[in-house]
């Protein structure tokens, strides 16, 4: 019985690691056909924001220039001019299809992530007792570590998250989240988040050291500052 009770939190921990991927994959597959059918049959217009309009216009201009250059190399005749118009028409339709698929991708991924968040939130609430056990194990493990190891771990974690080289990692992570939710890549928003989020984390961390860690283990704070200097 004791082994079973000890194994249950470990199984719950493993499920927390692998369940999000499985839920995301399953929900995505279930919604894919429905979202595609709804968008293709229920939407009479294509909705584009300024960034998408600019991107589509740039692609169209680039395509037109390439086709025009190709026709300039050939002899000018009515047949070639007709073929040029047909080529522009076909490629324009192809660009619209690609844009339509991108919109379906955006709706699908956003809906999938919202549903996954709701399911995982409910799963966490139902497994609150197991989370308490895992938390007690983690606290016991950290308590048994020496102050030097704790200080080194804190220093390593802070350097990775809010160090001078961390903006590159934040840029990749935020860009990945943007892509996962199906949002259009926006350099201005990503740059703004990269420049502000680590600063906020750094402020919170310093406040945590001042209010909590300094009271809990003054020797750990001394070692941390010595290693940091």
Curated annotation (Swiss-Prot):
Catalysed reactions listed for this entry: K(+)(in) + H(+)(out) = K(+)(out) + H(+)(in)
Localization in the cell: Plastid, Chloroplast inner membrane
UniProt membrane topology term: Multi-pass membrane protein
Pfam families: CemA
Keywords of the record: Antiport, Chloroplast, Hydrogen ion transport, Ion transport, Membrane, Plastid, Plastid inner membrane, Potassium, Potassium transport, Transmembrane, Transmembrane helix, Transport
Protein's UniProt keywords contain Chloroplast: yes
Entry GO CC: chloroplast inner membrane
GO biological process: potassium ion transport
Keyword Transmembrane appears in the UniProt entry: yes
Transmembrane segments: 7-27, 107-127, 189-209
An MF annotation (GO) of this entry: antiporter activity
Family as reported in the entry's similarity comment: Belongs to the CemA family.
PANTHER family: CHLOROPLAST ENVELOPE MEMBRANE PROTEIN, CHLOROPLAST ENVELOPE MEMBRANE PROTEIN-RELATED
Free-text function comment from the UniProt entry: Contributes to K(+)/H(+) antiport activity by supporting proton efflux to control proton extrusion and homeostasis in chloroplasts in a light-dependent manner to modulate photosynthesis. Prevents excessive induction of non-photochemical quenching (NPQ) under continuous-light conditions. Indirectly promotes efficient inorganic carbon uptake into chloroplasts.
Name of this protein: Potassium/proton antiporter CemA
Organism: Atropa belladonna
């Amino acid at each position: 019985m004791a082994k079973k009770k000890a194994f249950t939190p470990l199984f719950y921990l493993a499920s927390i690691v692998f369940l999000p991927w499985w839920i995301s994959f399953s929900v995505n597959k279930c919604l894919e056909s429905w979202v595609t059918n709804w968008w293709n049959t229920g939407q009479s217009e294509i909705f584009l924001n300024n960034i998408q309009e600019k991107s589509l216009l740039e692609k169209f201009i680039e395509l037109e220039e390439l086709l025009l250059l190709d026709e300039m190399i050939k002899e000018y005749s009515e047949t070639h001019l007709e073929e040029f118009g047909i080529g522009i028409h076909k490629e324009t339709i192809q660009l619209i299809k690609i844009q339509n698929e991108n919109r379906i991708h955006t709706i699908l991924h956003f809906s999938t992530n919202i549903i996954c968040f709701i399911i995982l939130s409910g799963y966490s609430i139902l497994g609150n007792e197991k989370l308490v056990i895992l938390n007690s194990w983690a606290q016991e493990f950290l308590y048994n570590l020496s102050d030097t190891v704790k200080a080194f771990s804190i220093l390593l974690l802070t350097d990775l998250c809010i160090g001078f080289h961390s903006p590159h990692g934040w840029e990749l992570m935020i860009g990945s989240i943007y892509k996962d939710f199906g949002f259009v890549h926006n350099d201005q928003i990503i740059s703004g988040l990269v420049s502000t989020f680590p600063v906020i984390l750094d402020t919170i961390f310093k406040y945590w050291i001042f209010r909590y860690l300094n009271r809990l283990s003054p020797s750990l704070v001394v070692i941390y500052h010595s290693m940091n200097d």
